From Swiss-Prot:
It comes from Canis lupus familiaris (Dog). This is Adenosine receptor A2a. GO terms for biological process: adenylate cyclase-activating G protein-coupled receptor signaling pathway; apoptotic signaling pathway; eating behavior; G protein-coupled adenosine receptor signaling pathway; inhibitory postsynaptic potential; locomotory behavior; negative regulation of alpha-beta T cell activation; negative regulation of inflammatory response. Residues 1-7, 67-77, 144-173, 259-266 are extracellular. Receptor for adenosine. The activity of this receptor is mediated by G proteins which activate adenylyl cyclase. It holds the Pfam family 7tm_1. Residues 392-412 are annotated as: Disordered. Keywords: Cell membrane, Disulfide bond, G-protein coupled receptor, Glycoprotein, Membrane, Receptor, Transducer, Transmembrane, Transmembrane helix, Ubl conjugation. Ubiquitinated. Deubiquitinated by USP4; leading to stabilization and expression at the cell surface. It is found in: Cell membrane. The cytoplasmic C-terminal domain is necessary for targeting the non-ubiquitinated form of this protein to the cell surface. Glycans are attached at residues 145, 154. Interacts (via cytoplasmic C-terminal domain) with USP4; the interaction is direct. May interact with DRD4. Interacts with NECAB2. Interacts (via cytoplasmic C-terminal domain) with GAS2L2; interaction enhances receptor-mediated adenylyl cyclase activity. The lineage of its organism: Eukaryota, Metazoa, Chordata, Craniata, Vertebrata. The chain crosses the membrane at residues 8-32, 43-66, 78-100, 121-143, 174-198, 235-258, 267-290.
Length: 412
């Protein structure tokens, strides 16, 4: 590639790195600040964001360095080349975990709290990262081209003894990339996710039809299910974009491996597919902001407070049970009951059991405003009734005139 082309590639990669870091730091920041977003599903979202941050901080600089073909010891070059595979694998495992989490939430919601806990989610995330390093760094254990003789293709006459011209395809064997990396650990998980989301949508469609056939359909259950479907659609979009960004590069690798007599893909096309794969680390925050209201509102508050320096106290969206703190005239705590279940909301807006996680119906990711401590079957009628009771008990209290009372679903 020409010098101008190299500079264009490097400039685009650096821009992607900056956007990936800023956008995904914003995602982690939002989950940390907003209690409505602190749920099991978003643990996996944060893991996905961490992988995308690492792409911007490490993988893209490594890719730029490798593109220069600098001289290095073969195993040093191999580590640079394989590190991006670790991050790709972590992203795939996070997406698969999210898909399974949503499947459980819709298919067996009553067992969700028992099956999907914060402790288990953190353990699964740790296992996913360990497996990602094991899979991505497998070439370091011997499945590589470093054992080829010096006159082999991965050695440059301009490099010293024991050094190679550090280029990805010259140190990472293509059979590893195609059979092991792509077929086993990219394509299979993507197909599993496709099947999971298909079953989610079919199950949701069947349940909605059953509700329509009931003489007195439950509006709360219907609204909850619609919010779950909305969340599943948002996450399915993220999976689709991942496939769109990564499949072109893997398809080129397949052509290179299975058709050695065919001409190799032009260098500009290789760089274009590499840039496209790295672009995937940028898009997820935009999907969250566009599709999930709670993320969008929190992003806006963070930008106003910390970027534009417009000081305002951070408060979670007015749609959570945490935010339903009411005070009497003498400052005493008012005990609230939602559908006969005390949610444990205190006068200062905190809950006595912050470690409790929502069931499949009330994830902050789903509704963009349903609280982690709220009861799973609380719907708009309950909220309106509670609002009237609060107003009667303490007129100075803001009650529930926030977004939930206004548009109910809490979904953009």
């Amino acid at each position: 590639m020409s010098t101008m082309g190299s500079w264009v590639y490097i400039t685009v990669e650096l821009a992607i790195a900056v956007l990936a870091i800023l956008g995904n730091v914003l995602v982690c920041w939002a989950v940390w600040l907003n209690s409505n977003l602190q749920n099991v599903t978003n643990y996996f979202v944060v893991s996905l964001a961490a992988a995308d941050i690492a792409v911007g901080v490490l993988a893209i600089p490594f890719a730029i360095t490798i593109s220069t073909g600098f001289c290095a010891a073969c195993h040093n070059c191999l580590f640079f080349a394989c590190f991006v595979l670790v991050l790709t694998q972590s992203s795939i495992f996070s997406l698969l975990a999210i898909a399974i989490d949503r499947y459980i939430a819709i298919r067996i919601p009553l067992r969700y709290n028992g099956l999907v806990t914060g402790t288990r989610a953190k353990g699964i995330i740790a296992v996913c990262w360990v497996l990602s390093f094991a899979i991505g760094l497998t070439p370091m254990l011997g499945w590589n081209n470093c054992s080829q003789p010096k006159e082999g293709r991965n050695y440059s006459q301009g490099c010293g003894e024991g050094q190679v011209a550090c280029l990805f395809e010259d140190v990472v064997p293509m059979n590893y990339m195609v059979y092991y990396n792509f077929f086993a650990f990219v394509l299979v998980p993507l197909l599993l996710m496709l099947g999971v989301y298909l079953r989610i949508f079919l199950a949701a469609r069947r349940q909605l039809k059953q509700m329509e056939s009931q003489p007195l359909p439950g509006e709360r259950a219907r609204s909850t299910l619609q919010k779950e479907v909305h969340a599943a659609k948002s996450l399915a979009i993220i999976v689709g974009l991942f496939a769109l960004c990564w499949l072109p590069l893997h398809i080129i690798n397949c052509f290179t491996f299975f058709c050695p007599e065919c001409s190799h893909a032009p260098l500009w096309l290789m760089y274009l597919t590499i840039v496209l794969s790295h672009t995937n680390s940028v898009v997820n925050p935009f999907i969250y902001a566009y599709r999930i209201r709670e993320f969008r509102q929190t992003f806006r508050k963070i930008i106003r407070s910390h970027v534009l320096r417009r000081r305002e106290p951070f408060k979670a969206g007015g749609t959570s049970a945490r935010a339903l703190a009411a005070h009497g005239s003498d400052g005493e705590q008012i005990s609230l009951r939602l559908n006969g279940h005390p949610p444990g909301v205190w006068a200062n807006g905190s809950a006595p059991h912050p470690e409790r996680r929502p069931n499949g119906y009330t994830l902050g990711l789903v509704s963009g405003g349903i609280a982690p401590e709220s009861h799973g079957d609380m719907g708009l009628p309950d909220v309106e009734l509670l609002s009237h009771e609060l107003k009667g008990a303490c007129p100075e209290s803001p009650g529930l005139e926030g977004p939930l009372a206004q548009d109910g679903a809490g979904v953009s």
